Curated annotation (Swiss-Prot):
GO biological process, one term: DNA repair
Chain sites annotated for binding NAD(+): D33, H34, Q35, Y36, D37, S83, L84, E117, R140, E175, K282, K306
Lineage: Bacteria, Pseudomonadati, Pseudomonadota, Alphaproteobacteria, Rickettsiales
Cellular-component GO terms for this entry: cytosol
Organism: Anaplasma marginale (strain St. Maries)
Keywords, alphabetical: DNA damage, DNA repair, DNA replication, Ligase, Magnesium, Manganese, Metal-binding, NAD, Zinc
Protein's UniProt name: DNA ligase
Record's function text: DNA ligase that catalyzes the formation of phosphodiester linkages between 5'-phosphoryl and 3'-hydroxyl groups in double-stranded DNA using NAD as a coenzyme and as the energy source for the reaction. It is essential for DNA replication and repair of damaged DNA.
Length: 673
């Protein structure tokens, strides 16, 4: 029995070593995180059951595997960057708390506060500062030595290069990751399996310009050798220094609240726009952290509460294709419905033709499907051991299934694309959905189903048609249609009217220009400040072979802007939209940071004469203010129009400053001058 256990341990270590090399060394994992965790758990159970075989454990306390054939110099961390112990159940978390309390010899009435933070699914890094100046950025590597990625990290947006009032030597740690939106753009030109691999591969590019174009994000979560008393103080100071920190954090001494936070994050994670794979619980007191110390592999004062498996096995019934907003034709797996994490899944993305060929996916196969918060789940693997003789290879279409145009593959890309743009009905439909989305014009009540309804009835054919919808609906009785009533129609019309005032950055994003996401749209808007300036500059750009320089924007984004303005149909849509919308000027970062209302809470009440409530709200937000719906002790200013109501009375009772509309207009003008 003992010999069998020893052989099983050797086999598990061989598998773990193999997968660690693929994951940490080559950024090309063969198995999912869940499958890897199962191997780790099996090894732990084996060692618990047969403690005598631990002497044969030749792969213990391993943090990571150094990057193979690394082109980046290796550097040593100030302190080891250890991995975290995992918890998979509430009982595991309770055992962790019990273990910590016992180690610290706490009494039942003694308080043990936890910091509950999102566990980012990206690539760990450390940033070293000497005298407040950024001198080095490194990957985690094997936990003791990492790769020097300083040059590439310098283009990470928002990573401070200089800190005020910092310790002489400070090491800040965090995670580099990629938003889903940026990964989807990249997927057409690079063959990364997921956002985490894309982030790890992108930060290791030899060309810094490519790194910048990949639009990587980061979050900082700890500061080594700092003198702060708590993790809460560390996060606050990191934020004040200008680091990006995750604001979704809870500090509590009650395990019930920590678990409730975990459950809340688990159910809402799909709205984050990036991948997380659990919640990290840390002992808040840094003094307690020092007392607890670490094992060879992980700190004793923290644990990662991992999300449950989001994978399942089901039959691939068929493969269809769909056309996206930018013309990318994506193969979709039509599945035998399966419950994954409490959600019935019948469709999943196959990414592109290269992925189908690489995985050798065939119709009739048993496939492994992963759902990790994405809008469309993914086929991550094929179970070829159970493949029958009746499976069929998929033949990718040569023409667009929507408009019939011949599909093209641009140089350096893996995706096939329909280039008919707005004359392709499928692309036009997806652009309308994008246009009304939260970061676009944010039209409530005009979701995917409503848009498809109006498109199918010939009422919307392009984004410009949205603002003619009210007129077209006259004489049409929607009450007879399923899902529509007098109130829902009235609410929709009101929402469209309210959206007619829009900030320039939101408008640019809403157009759905390729490579122009939320961040890029903001950079463009801040550069040109007004719609007129932007429109004129882009038209001039199409008439020259020269390019323009917009701080923070890469060549692909500039070329995409130029291409968009080179299409006559797009210019016609812009002309129609600019006549119907009130596109507000964009404030510069300097204006937002230095304005008198930056960081202050403003409330509007009553009827405004010179602008809508939406326009006033956008004005305030563009200058860095926070707009609230109700007056409280935290309110800095109340702008009162005619018939102000109870908010005015409450403001007076709380000694909140109250001004009229004319004073507000003057305040905005002064802030922008």
């Amino acid at each position: 029995m003992l010999e069998q256990a020893r052989r099983r341990l050797a086999g598990l270590n061989a598998k773990l070593r193999h997968h660690d090399v693929l994951y940490h060394g080559l950024d090309a994992p063969e198995v999912t995180d869940h499958q890897y965790d199962l191997l780790v758990q099996e090894k732990k159970r084996l060692l618990d059951e047969f403690p005598d075989i631990s002497q044969y454990d030749d792969y213990a306390d391993v943090v990571g595997t150094p990057k193979i054939d690394s082109r980046f110099p290796k550097v040593q961390h100030l302190e080891p960057m250890l991995s975290l112990e995992n918890a998979f159940t509430v009982q595991d978390v309770e055992k962790f708390i019990t273990r910590v309390r016992r180690f610290l010899e706490l009494q039942p009435d003694d308080i043990l506060e936890l910091s509950c933070e999102l566990k980012m699914d990206g690539m760990s890094f450390s940033a070293l500062y000497h005298g407040g100046k950024l001198t080095r950025v490194a990957t985690r590597g094997n936990g003791h030595f990492g790769e020097d990625i300083t040059t590439n990290a310098m283009v990470l947006r928002g990573l401070p290069h200089q800190l005020d009032s910092a310790p002489e030597v400070l090491e800040v740690r965090g995670e580099i990751y990629m938003h889903h939106e940026d990964f989807e753009k990249l997927r057409g030109s690079c063959n990364f399996a997921n956002p985490r691999n894309a982030a790890a591969g992108s930060i290791r590019q030899l060309n810094q310009k490519i790194v910048e174009e990949r639009n990587l994000s980061y979050v900082a979560y700890s500061a080594v050798n700092s003198t702060f008393a708590t993790q809460q103080e560390i996060l606050k100071q990191l934020d004040e220094w200008g680091f990006h920190t995750n604001k979704q954090v809870l500090f509590t001494d009650k395990i019930e609240e920590a678990i409730a936070f975990y459950n809340s994050v688990y159910t809402t994670r799909s709205a984050l726009g990036y991948d997380i794979d659990g919640v990290v619980y840390k002992v808040n007191s840094t003094n307690f952290q020092k007392l607890l110390g670490a094992t060879g592999k992980s700190p004793r004062w923290a644990i990662a509460h991992k999300f449950p498996s989001t994978e399942a096995r089901t039959k691939l019934l068929d493969i269809t294709v769909q056309v996206g907003r930018t013309g990318v034709v994506t193969p979709i797996a039509e599945l035998e419905p399966i419950n994954i994490g409490g959600v019935m899944v019948s469709r999943a993305s196959l990414h592109n033709l290269n992925e189908i060929e690489r995985k050798d996916v065939r119709i009739g196969d048993l496939v492994i499907v992963k759902r990790a918060g994405e809008v469309i789940p993914q086929v991550v693997d094929v179970d070829k051991t159970l493949r029958s003789s009746g499976t069929q290879k998929f033949v990718f279409p040569s023409h667009c299934p929507s408009c019939g145009s011949k599909l093209h593959r641009e140089p350096g890309e893996v995706a096939l694309r329909c280039v008919a743009e707005l004359s392709c009905k499928a692309q036009a439909l997806e652009r309308v959905k994008h246009f009304v989305s939260r970061d676009g014009l944010n039209i409530m009540g005009l979701g995917a189903k409503q848009i498809e309804f109006f498109c199918n009835h010939g009422l919307i054919g392009s984004i410009a048609d949205i603002f003619s919808l009210e007129e077209k609906l006259h004489g049409i009785n929607l009450d007879t249609e399923h899902g529509w009533g007098e109130k829902s129609v009235a609410n929709l019309i009101a929402a469209i009217r309210n959206s007619a005032t829009v900030r320039l950055s939101n408008f640019i994003f809403a157009l759905g220009i390729r490579f122009i996401g939320v961040g890029a749209a903001k950079l463009v808007a801040e550069h040109y400040r007004s719609y007129k300036n932007w429109h004129q500059a882009m038209l001039a750009l199409t008439e020259t072979h020269d390019t323009v320089q917009i701080r923070g924007l890469g060549e692909k984004s500039i070329s995409s802007l130029k291409a968009f303005f080179s299409v006559q149909g797009n210019l016609e849509v812009l002309e129609s939209l600019s006549a119907k919308l009130n596109i507000l000027d964009e404030a510069s970062p300097a204006q937002r940071g230095s304005s008198a209302i930056s960081g202050k809470t403003v409330v509007f009440t009553g009827t405004l004469e010179s602008m809508s409530r939406t326009e006033a709200k956008l004005q305030a937000e563009s200058l860095g203010a926070k707009v609230a719906n109700s007056v409280s002790a935290n309110t800095w200013l109340l702008v009162a129009g005619s018939n102000p109501g109870s908010k005015h009375e409450k403001a007076l009772s709380l000694n909140v400053r109250v001004i009229d509309e004319q004073t507000w207009v003057k305040m905005v003008e002064d802030a922008r001058s």
